[in-house]
């Protein structure tokens, strides 16, 4: 039947399930449930049901038995299936493997062993430098090419939460997070701007209007600049695409301000991955308003970004298997 492994990547909004056999991807599905949906016990049961259904679907469709389940992201948090404590940075891939939590959850799958990967915490509790990762650590270790293992690289992840992460010579060392992705969703769905921009995934990013939004936020403030987006549409004749780009610029002004200390670090490469519209808006502002960056900039497509957690979790699992074999 082969060695079938299910990889679970739990996000704030969605949970992705990928079935692999050895190193080949067999199937994948995404369920619209995440950390933002599971703040009470009843909704946590929905997450358990979603995982159970995904396992049953994979096993039935592909006539297989899943024996190993690798899980990372918010599914390992207090609103997930099993809470795993964060590791204190700096953290290398081998440390993630050492601290992985194996367990049985027979009410979800009677046969599989679950392996829950810990997140990473940074700084001191209550300090301005405190922050956390859950899930992005496996994406970053999935993105590191063998020839880059000992380099210094900045990663910027664009999703429900935007993050800039510093990888230094084998370990993840620093991280800064913003809530810009969730803010964009809230603005587009629960404010008066809903009628001004429509569905946010329908439009591309227009650099010139991103920069207008950035400059408005820089000159005024966050809240005032957002209302200016509506004024620009009503009085200034902005299209929905231009208005949305303006809002991206406002969010990028906030992000670049938060990310600036790490952007000033000397690194070999800057890697952008995740949601493409955010990445394009970030580049439109970084090139004009950000600190001078002399290293290489690599932009991963959304499709490439989706594969990173699979690669990273596979590498963590291979590290575990290698250590077990060495101890026999």
Where are these regions (language model features)?
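Short glycine-rich phosphate-binding loop at a beta-alpha junction
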Residues: 63-75, 252, 266-276
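Glycine-rich phosphate-binding loops at beta-strand->alpha-helix junctions
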Residues: 14, 267-285, 306
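Glycine-rich phosphate-binding/hydrolytic loop that grips phosphoryl groups
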Residues: 284, 298-328
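Adenine-nucleotide phosphate-binding core of ATP-dependent small-molecule kinases
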Residues: 215-258
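Short glycine-rich, Thr/Ser-proximal phosphate-binding strand/loop in the N-terminal lobe
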Residues: 5-46
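A short acidic Gly-Thr/Ser loop motif
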Residues: 8-14, 74, 156-161, 180, ...
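Short beta-strand-loop/turn "lid" adjacent to the catalytic site in phosphate-handling enzymes
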Residues: 58-105, 110-130
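Glycine-rich phosphate-binding loop plus the immediately following alpha-helix
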Residues: 36-40, 120-158, 163-219
